[in-house]
Amino acid sequence: MLARALLAVEGLLRRKVAPAKVKQLLLLEYILPLGSCVHLTPFFEALKLCRSDVSITVATRGLGLQVLRHSPYIDRLIETPDPLTDLKAAVLFLRGRLRRLKLQPDCVLTGASDQRTRIALLGLLGSSGWRGGYTLRPTLYQRPLDYDRSVSLIANNLRLAGIFRCRPERAEPRVFFSHENAETARALLREANPEGLPLVVMVTQNSGGQATGWHTERFVEVIRHAAEGLGCAVVYVGTSGDAPSIEMIRKAAGRVGTSIAGRTSVTELAAVLAMSDAMVTLDTGTMHVGRAVKTPMVVLGPSWQRPIEWLPLEVSNVRILRGVDRDTVPENYRLDEISVESVIAALDDLLRAYPASVGARADRAEQSLSSIDHLAAGA
């Protein structure tokens, strides 16, 4: 009843702009696992290619800011307090910032990961315009969407473009980085690979909350094969919190490779991955960043999670290894179905199809390089 009353009052007080005539769009992004942030990026590109006249503002925080900082497919970022912990502060801040920027959004959208009542209320109370997208409170939205579990998270996010009668084809995520990020990445890689060998990145740690890890002794065999069998330099990436576990694996592998865990921002990580020849990676946030910069990779996926939702299916430079689908996670599960031999075979096949190449690394880096900085002073 309250929601219907609010919408009725809103209908009398707020101007109504049809989707075809929208010029100012505000998107709210506050559910911030790295993979969720990366999987929203195809929407921005799709809408800009279809409707270049629409100005896109994103209100977000944390990883949302990092992922979109250098994107050419949005027009501005607004950093706000977290509405999930302090809705009032977020509403007041967003109102004030929109007022200072002289922005009156024609609509407010939320992506497939941001289905939270407080985020919907931030759109209602903090901004002008009708609301559309994914929500747990469809009565608060004029154009709600239902999540389609038969398609990927990316495909669900692309359905936002359909509100504006845009029909994007399959799109890949993108993460852009600055020239400064690229220089930082080059310096790290010169330190890790002074001889300029082919470079394989190892992502050995998961996000911490899910059963997506692999056995240390199996990683060790793959690492040694990359170094001794393929003649590659090995670099380990991750967060500062991952560093001790990574060092344990590195020592178990005879101190093969160099760890740069905790030494990169998201965009510096993107540059490092773009400048590498291949990745062997768990299904974790770093994998999604690697996909977004088009790095060839072998992905070790969990059998208990629906592959269509998160994994880069039908991407030519990705080899996915996982067990038969299961509904439950066995105790102490560590991707037990994935053998050392299968990972080594997949890595060998990947590097035959996509040979280590200075030119390929340079092309990948160039495609993700951006001169835009939405967080720079005066931006």
Features from the language model and the residues they span:
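Catalytic machinery of carbohydrate-active enzymes
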Residues: 1-379
